[in-house]
């Protein structure tokens, strides 16, 4: 019953928005993308879901970064997307930046980043409202970013492309079949929806 209630809620919420995502194609230079990849170098750790390594849901490596230049880089894109897509969510901070590496067969199955509810408050009283993913390279196959329930597929994102979307929308990264896929993922938080 709980799952049915959640699915019904998602349908209602999704009907209330007209833009599911906002994309900039090839916006960041190859040099910036490489600089972001280099944040990982030798510090990769196995990605977790709810503080557990669950290979059936996610197979990737991550590095968290608190480099100020990264926050300065991503924030203007979020504010622009929030306005132009018409979401106009109350965003107060950028929360967490993660460089992710998907090797062959790496993936992240269907998931949401946040519901914007009181049930998932971070210790600062805010919750994830917008998610951003930046593709840092193009020399891989598979590893497509997909959103569930869209009648039109998300276009293939190439190196330097940025996608911003509401954190409550279900999405995934399909298995990488060749090469290594790198991305930068970050979240933007604000007070819970009323």
Describe each region flagged by the PLM.
Residues 4-100:
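Non-heme Fe(II)/2-oxoglutarate
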Residues 75, 79-194:
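Catalytic core of non-heme Fe(II) oxygenases with the double-stranded beta-helix
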């Amino acid at each position: 019953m709980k799952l049915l209630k959640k699915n019904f809620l998602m349908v209602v919420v999704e009907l209330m928005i007209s833009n599911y995502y906002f994309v900039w194609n090839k916006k960041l230079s190859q040099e910036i993308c490489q600089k972001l990849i280099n944040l990982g170098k030798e510090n990769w750790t196995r990605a977790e879901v709810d503080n557990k390594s669950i290979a059936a849901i996610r197979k990737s490596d991550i590095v968290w970064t608190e480099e100020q230049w990264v926050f300065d880089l991503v924030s203007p894109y979020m504010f622009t997307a929030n306005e132009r897509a018409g979401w106009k969510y109350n965003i107060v901070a950028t929360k967490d930046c993660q460089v992710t590496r998907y090797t062959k067969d790496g993936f992240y199955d269907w998931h949401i980043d946040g519901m914007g509810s009181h049930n998932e408050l971070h210790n600062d009283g805010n919750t994830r409202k917008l998610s951003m993913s930046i593709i840092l390279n193009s020399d891989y196959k598979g590893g497509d970013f997909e959103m569930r329930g869209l009648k039109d597929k998300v276009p293939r994102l190439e190196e330097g492309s940025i996608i911003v979307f509401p954190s409550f929308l279900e999405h995934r990264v399909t298995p990488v079949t060749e090469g290594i896929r790198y991305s930068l993922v970050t979240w933007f938080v604000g007070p819970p929806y009323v």
